[in-house]
Amino acid sequence: MPASRCYAQTSPLDTGCLFKLSGRIANDGGHPEMFYPVAKPMQAPAGYDLYTEVRKHDVLLAYPYQSIRPFIRMLLRAGADPNVVSIKMTLYRMASDSQIVGALINAAENGKEVVAMVELRARFDEQNNIDWSKQLQDAGCTVLYGFDDYKVHSKLTLITSRVDGKYRYLT
C-alpha cells in the first residue's frame, strides 16, 4: 500500500477520528478497492429444521454469515413445544422489528418461562432495547439488565425441556 494511503495514529486504541473519513469515501464510487464485498448470509436448505438438528448433534451458528431464519423458526417451535418449560436468552442489539423478541413473547403467551437478559447500552439500539424490554415484561417475561461494570455483548440461548421426567438442555 502506498504511503499516501497510510494513516499514522499516536494512540493504538482511539481511532474515532477515522469516522470523519466515512463521508469522504463512498462505497458506490471513487475507491471500491477500499471496501470488502457486501456479505450475504448463507441460506439454509429448504426444509432445514434447526430444532431437530440440534437434538442430534452440535450446530455452530455464525451471524451474519448465515441466515438467522432457522434460529427464529427454532425459537417459535420451542415456544409451541409442550415439553419446553423455559427459554432463557441474552439480547444485545434488538432491531425495531425484532422477530426474536416476537418469538419470546409468543413463548411466554404459551406458558413458557421466558427470561431475557437485555443490554441497555447497545450502541445505537438503546431505545429499541428499552422499548422491547417493556413489551417483554408486559407479556410476562422476566427481564434482567446488564451489570454496571460489564457490557453484555454475546448472544446465548438456553432452551430447557422436560421429557419422560428428565430435563434436557439446548444451548
In which residue ranges do the predicted regions lie?
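N-terminal localization/anchoring segments of enzymes in phospholipid and broader phosphate metabolism
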Residues: 1-171
